[in-house]
């Protein structure tokens, strides 16, 4: 329904404009006719309008039912005016009208060109509806008038005076209000009319006016009116203060602008405008064109003013000029438009990377939330995984999926805090930190910012860069990042920071706590094969100028390269080996084309040709061949570059019960060996180990590859198995590897890096893996995403160490071990192996 079909409230605001002056000064005369309330009176619903007694107001009428009511009335007929509870209702029922209103007289009606009517009504008395008697053709109701008390005494005089003062103040503060209105207000002697008239014209919501007419007693209505008048005075005074301040600031700016233009014109006329002043003017123009924050504008304007007073030959000139140029070069308030299309983003992520489902899901979740709430803070992610799994390239793909700029800085070897926060301008050659420089390079305030190798940050006497990153990577603080060079807060809250690390251990706990860690595991053989066929081989063929139709790689050949020429968690060395093959092929193609009889036959790389392309095999899958000696167990280890297998060797010799540990072991690993030996001693009867074995025989535990430092609790199970094997003279079953932490009670605790360890075991030819019972969930998760890669590996889970030893050790060949003492010097002998 269009607007012209509704009643329009035509009540003037508290400005008391020109047309009302006469109405105010002419107070209404007493109604001579007596309104009879013994019968039903017609009811006219009003939208957002309240009729007060004694007040004359114009009302627009457009509804047919209301027009029918007005046409049926005789001159000066009484009508009950009730406001609707909901102004949007076109045909209100009795339940949709307020029960309190006013009875008034229709003084005049006027038909409008659009067939609506304009009526002039005068309120007479407040009434309350007792019951509605009809609804068609218009509403009618039986009403009861409300008696008004006599307004006498000092108290009502005070109410009247206060009301007049506030009304006059509002007229004084209101723009375009005639001065006569204030005089007319002061001349009103009837307190009831004064209160009702001002209440009718004050600019407050209609619901508040309805509460005012429902209030019992003039005192209550007067107090409510004074409350609204006070509020209006406060609003107008505050508005005036704001306008005065704005006008003063504008006058100052205009005066400064005019003076500068005059100075510029005078200098041009005199030919005195030098290059320095031209530079200063260009800087001022640049400040005016850029949408800088108020604080930044104030600082840079002061620096430009200082620049205009510094001689160009002074060293301070270049320092100040560089500072101003840096501020103007930053993208204050400029953001790249992010066009969010989840299907397109998912397509881009899948085009660039194979697998990595968790990471892709996290990015798509962020995009979905960003589409629902555009002002959300960007996440702080940390990709943790071995080298070569695609952490850095994944950041580029994320930027492409978001449609944003990509900035990368390497933090490896950074030791100076100023690299992050910048140098203060007091130093010679000072400059912003690498964060602000990256934002400047990006040219936008919401790039994808990669902090590469965050785990390789150092620290020295110049400070700890990790501490400076705490503010950068804290969403609650980085909206006002303070660079030492700028000394002005810069908003980094819309920047999507992505950190990369090979391991989390070197990262300080407070910094780690600010990031959402996403672990990227090493690739399985199946994943590497797909990555090679889909990404690496096509890329290397293109980089070496070889057409795809000229060369093809057999799948078995690619698998052979993966298993025999690389041993890594990622695919970086795999790409190098493929590049080596492509170089040899490129040489062959060129030689064939330069020969007398060019040969364009496509080349197929098969397994038999790998020796020609890459030389002898570098790795063998049977590295964990069966060991025929007791005291040797195979463990699983996690390293920053992926998983690996670990041999634990033990032997006994004549001695005094010492434990000898070699192989460059860390403190945690040494403690695991001590705990394993203590557990064996406590369970010697169960494993049928004589007491003499611990008193008169030394045991030596060695971990090969002694040049490599080793540490961690996950070798505890393997060390205990090795010790149990040498003391019981029972061999470990072949093709079994294990991992887990042990306690003195013989419990097996869960460890991390399960997927990497399982991949290492599979590469080494292990067919059965023993794991802590609580790591079963990790294996299930790995099987869900890479089930085919572990099809030929079985898993067993243990909670107690004695159960594991009973399972993994074969029966003793010569019965129980014998540790004898032949003489009083305790010279022992054993039927087992003294060394390996």
Curated annotation (Swiss-Prot):
Domain Lon proteolytic, chain residue ranges per copy: 627-811
Ranges for domain Lon N-terminal: 41-233
Chain sites annotated for binding ATP: 385-392
Swiss-Prot/TrEMBL GO biological process terms: cellular response to heat; protein quality control for misfolded or incompletely synthesized proteins
Region (Disordered): 816-836
Induction entry: By heat shock.
GO MF terms, alphabetically ordered: ATP binding; ATP hydrolysis activity; ATP-dependent peptidase activity; sequence-specific DNA binding; serine-type endopeptidase activity
Enzyme kind, highest EC tier: hydrolase
Keyword terms: ATP-binding, Cytoplasm, Hydrolase, Nucleotide-binding, Protease, Serine protease, Stress response
CDD domains: RecA-like_Lon
Cellular component GO terms held in the UniProt record: cytoplasm
Reactions this protein catalyses: Hydrolysis of proteins in presence of ATP
A Pfam family it matches: LON_substr_bdg
Source superkingdom: Bacteria
Active-site residues annotated for this sequence: 714, 757
EC number(s) recorded for this UniProt protein: 3.4.21.53
Role: ATP-dependent serine protease that mediates the selective degradation of mutant and abnormal proteins as well as certain short-lived regulatory proteins. Required for cellular homeostasis and for survival from DNA damage and developmental changes induced by stress. Degrades polypeptides processively to yield small peptide fragments that are 5 to 10 amino acids long. Binds to DNA in a double-stranded, site-specific manner.
Record PANTHER family: ATP DEPENDENT LON PROTEASE FAMILY MEMBER (PTHR10046)
Family to which the UniProt record says this protein belongs: Belongs to the peptidase S16 family.
Quaternary structure note: Homohexamer. Organized in a ring with a central cavity.
Name by which UniProt lists this protein: Lon protease
Taxonomic lineage of the native organism: Bacteria, Pseudomonadati, Chlorobiota, Chlorobiia, Chlorobiales
Gene (UniProt): lon
């Amino acid at each position: 329904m269009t607007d012209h079909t509704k009643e329009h409230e035509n009540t003037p605001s508290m400005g008391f404009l020109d047309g009302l002056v006469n109405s105010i000064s002419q107070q209404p005369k007493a109604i001579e006719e007596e309104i009879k309330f013994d019968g039903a009176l017609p009811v006219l619903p009003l939208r957002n309008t309240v009729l007060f007694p004694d007040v004359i107001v114009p009302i627009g009428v457009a509804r047919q039912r209301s027009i029918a009511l007005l046409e049926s009335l005789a001159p000066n007929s009484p009508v009950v005016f009730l406001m609707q509870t909901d102004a949007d209702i076109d045909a209100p029922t009795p339940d949709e009208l307020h029960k309190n209103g006013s009875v008034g007289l229709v003084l005049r009606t006027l038909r409008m060109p659009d067939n609506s009517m304009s009526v002039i009504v005068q309120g007479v008395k407040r009434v309350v509806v007792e019951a509605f008697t009809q609804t068609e053709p218009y509403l009618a109701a039986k009403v009861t008038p409300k008696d008004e008390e006599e307004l006498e005494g000092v108290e009502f005089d005070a109410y009247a005076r206060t009301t007049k003062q506030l009304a006059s103040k509002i007229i004084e503060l209101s723009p375009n209000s005639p001065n006569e209105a204030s005089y007319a207000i002061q001349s009103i002697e009837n307190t009831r009319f004064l209160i009702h008239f001002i209440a009718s014209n004050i600019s407050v919501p209609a619901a508040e006016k309805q509460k005012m007419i429902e209030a019992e007693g003039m005192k209550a209505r007067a107090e409510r009116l004074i409350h609204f008048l006070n509020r209006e005075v406060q609003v107008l005074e505050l508005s005036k203060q704001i306008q005065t301040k704005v006008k003063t600031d504008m006058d100052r700016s205009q005066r400064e602008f005019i003076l500068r233009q005059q100075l510029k014109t005078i200098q041009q006329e005199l030919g005195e405008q030098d290059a320095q002043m031209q530079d200063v003017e260009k800087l001022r123009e640049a400040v005016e064109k850029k949408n800088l924050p108020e604080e930044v504008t104030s600082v840079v304007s002061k620096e430009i003013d200082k620049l205009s007073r510094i001689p160009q030959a002074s060293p301070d000139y270049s320092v100040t000029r560089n500072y101003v140029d840096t501020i103007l070069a930053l993208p204050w308030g400029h953001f790249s438009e992010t066009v969010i299309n989840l299907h397109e983003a998912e397509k881009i992520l899948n085009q660039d990377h194979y697998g990595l489902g968790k990471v892709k899901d996290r990015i798509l979740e962020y995009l979905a939330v960003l589409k629902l709430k555009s002002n959300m803070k960007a996440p702080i992610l940390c990709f943790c995984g071995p080298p070569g799994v695609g952490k850095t390239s994944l950041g580029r793909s994320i930027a492409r999926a978001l449609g944003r700029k990509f900035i990368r800085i390497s933090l490896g070897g950074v030791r100076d805090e100023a690299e992050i926060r910048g140098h203060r301008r007091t130093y010679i050659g000072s400059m912003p930190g690498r964060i602000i420089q990256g934002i400047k390079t990006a040219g936008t305030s919401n790039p994808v910012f990669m902090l590469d190798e965050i785990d390789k940050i150092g620290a020295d006497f110049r400070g700890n860069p990790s501490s400076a990153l705490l503010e950068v990577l804290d969403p609650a603080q980085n909206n006002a990042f303070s660079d030492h060079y700028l000394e002005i807060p810069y908003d980094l809250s819309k920047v999507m920071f992505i950190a990369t690390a090979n391991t989390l251990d070197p990262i300080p706990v407070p910094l780690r706590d600010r990031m959402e860690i996403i672990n990227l595991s090493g690739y399985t053989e199946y994943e590497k094969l797909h990555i090679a066929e889909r990404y690496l081989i096509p890329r290397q063929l293109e980089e070496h100028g070889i057409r795809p139709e000229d060369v093809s790689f057999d799948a078995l050949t690619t698998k052979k390269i993966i298993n025999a020429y690389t041993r890594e968690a990622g695919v970086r060395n795999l790409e190098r080996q493929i590049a080596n093959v492509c170089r040899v092929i490129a040489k062959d193609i060129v030689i064939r084309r330069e020969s007398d009889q060019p040969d364009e036959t496509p080349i197929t790389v098969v397994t038999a040709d790998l020796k020609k392309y890459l030389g002898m095999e570098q790795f063998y899958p049977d590295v964990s061949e069966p060991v025929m000696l007791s005291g040797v167990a195979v463990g699983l280890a996690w390293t920053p570059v992926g998983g690996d297998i670990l041999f634990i060797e033990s032997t006994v010799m004549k001695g005094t019960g010492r434990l000898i540990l070699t192989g460059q072991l860390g403190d945690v690993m040494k403690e695991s060996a001590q705990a394993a030996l203590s557990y064996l001693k406590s369970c010697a009867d169960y494993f049928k180990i004589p007491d003499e074995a611990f008193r008169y025989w030394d045991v030596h535990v060695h971990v090969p590859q002694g040049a490599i430092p080793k540490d961690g609790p996950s070798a505890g199970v393997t060390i205990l198995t090795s010790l149990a094997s040498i003391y019981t003279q029972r061999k470990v079953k072949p093709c079994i590897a294990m991992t887990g932490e042990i306690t003195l009670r013989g419990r097996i605790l869960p460890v991390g890096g399960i997927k990497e360890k399982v991949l290492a075991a599979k590469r080494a030819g292990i067919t059965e893996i023993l794991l802590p019972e609580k790591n079963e969930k990790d294996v299930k998760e790995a099987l869900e995403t890479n089930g085919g890669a572990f099809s030929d590996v079985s898993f067993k889970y243990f909670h107690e160490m004695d159960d594991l030893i009973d399972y993994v050790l074969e029966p003793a060949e010569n019965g129980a071990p014998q540790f004898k003492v032949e003489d009083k010097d305790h010279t022992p002998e054993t039927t087992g192996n003294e060394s390996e």
